[in-house]
Amino acid sequence: MKEPLIFDLSRPGRKGYSLSPCDVPEVPLESIIPASLLRKEAVELPEVAENEVVRHFVRLSNLNYHVDKNMYPLGSCTMKYNPKVNDYTCDLSGFSALHPLQPTSTTQGALQLMYELSNMLAEIAGMAGVSLQPAAGAHGELTGILLIKKYHEVRGDKRHKLLVVDSAHGTNPASAALAGYETISVKSNGDGRTDLEDLRSKLDGDVAALMLTNPNTIGLFEKEIVQIAEMVHANGSLLYMDGANMNALLGITRPGDMGFDVMHYNLHKTFAAPHGGGGPGSGPVGVNEKLLPYLPAPLVVKEGDTYRLTSGGDDSIGRMMNFYGNFAVLVRAYTYIRMLGAEGLRRVSENAIINANYLLSKLLERYELPYPKPVMHEFCLSGDKQKKAHGVKTLDIAKRLLDYGFHAPTIYFPLIVSEALMIEPTETESKETLDIFADALLAIAREAEENPDVVKMAPSTTAVKRLDEATASRQLTICCM
């Protein structure tokens, strides 16, 4: 049943509150607030009893989909189960009751956590130093690009181009543009990896860096990464890694060892902080020795048994946000790493890779794989066969999956795959869950052949049915007051 808006539940005179009688003299508002600031009409607030308000929001919460309810297969999002011990440590009063402006003598535990987390992240990725300030992945990207820009500026090298592989996240060129760079696209080859000849043809004296994701967005490891790093560095450019897919690399290999100069982590993804509702995120940036002087300040340093914040050197790019990053996410990531240890982190990536390849092997029965396997932690199928043969688009398949009780995967991304259906099962899903999910997608493929209208009209069991997306894209009014 469709849940009405809270305003539709409103009835004149109903109240969900009880206030004590006013114990001060009442005065006309006009006598204390300028008339120009007063409303001309009464504010339109819903009048609803307390029990109806509670029931309304409980019903809405039951409609919500989240990783505690079922598998969340969004590709390139790493929607893994978030251990509840992370929330327990985050709620400890020694962390939750702190204020960032307290004297550092009273926040030694928090500073120790930040110091140790920075060191652990640096070790995991093979970097020389880490800043915890960036608030999300794209914010980390921007920070990394500004570090690259500072590196070249200090050398008097006025480079104005950034190379971005065509399978990259959309935030890569957006972050580059925000930092003032011209973005040049590098093609993928027939195997879905970086085309070295196209890269070579675009490397010139104006190129500040190449932005790369490894594994890339279709789940393939860039096997020629060492050669790519050599080509980029020989050009005087730097190599940036988007850490969106670090869940495939933990304990197996390190970006710093591959030749990357700078990267960002997504703590909310790889290190298990809830982000299905939009955040908060955390996108720390790791750098090698050549970029250390430019890291955002403040950083935490240890002197004897005491921790303190530094103001950064003369070449630091300065603050990237107020205070010290999204601290609650840092606590969760620290807990996750300490709970698992080095061996546990490696098992995370191994199991993520196993799950992705197992699920892929089942789905190849009816879906096309545009690039060769094996894959790493995720894969990208194509719905071209269903579209050409039966008029069923990837969008239809994704909508129909809702009727089977699953959140849809990422669709129509990356752009190099036609009718893309990108799936990342993560390491936390069992074989039984993967089997049920695979059976659902295979059933939808059969429906596309035998009764395509069922798929085209989906979803049919959700509270909100298929939206008129064409009208929504043309009429952009989203709120009526």
UniProtKB/Swiss-Prot annotation:
Record-listed E.C. numbers: 1.4.4.2
GO CC, alphabetical: cytosol; glycine cleavage complex
Chain positions with N6-(pyridoxal phosphate)lysine modification: 269
MF terms (GO), sorted A to Z: glycine binding; glycine dehydrogenase (decarboxylating) activity; pyridoxal phosphate binding
Cysteine pairings via disulfide bonds: none
Cofactors (names): pyridoxal 5'-phosphate
Record flagged with keyword Oxidoreductase: yes
GO aspect biological process, one term: glycine decarboxylation via glycine cleavage system
CDD domains cross-referenced by the UniProt entry: GDC-P
Presence of the UniProt keyword Glycoprotein in the record: no
Reaction catalysed by this enzyme: N(6)-[(R)-lipoyl]-L-lysyl-[glycine-cleavage complex H protein] + glycine + H(+) = N(6)-[(R)-S(8)-aminomethyldihydrolipoyl]-L-lysyl-[glycine-cleavage complex H protein] + CO2
Keywords: Oxidoreductase, Pyridoxal phosphate
Source organism superkingdom: Bacteria
Subunit record text: The glycine cleavage system is composed of four proteins: P, T, L and H. In this organism, the P 'protein' is a heterodimer of two subunits.
Function (record text): The glycine cleavage system catalyzes the degradation of glycine. The P protein binds the alpha-amino group of glycine through its pyridoxal phosphate cofactor; CO(2) is released and the remaining methylamine moiety is then transferred to the lipoamide cofactor of the H protein.
Family: Belongs to the GcvP family. C-terminal subunit subfamily.
The protein's name: Probable glycine dehydrogenase (decarboxylating) subunit 2
Species this protein is from: Chlorobium chlorochromatii (strain CaD3)
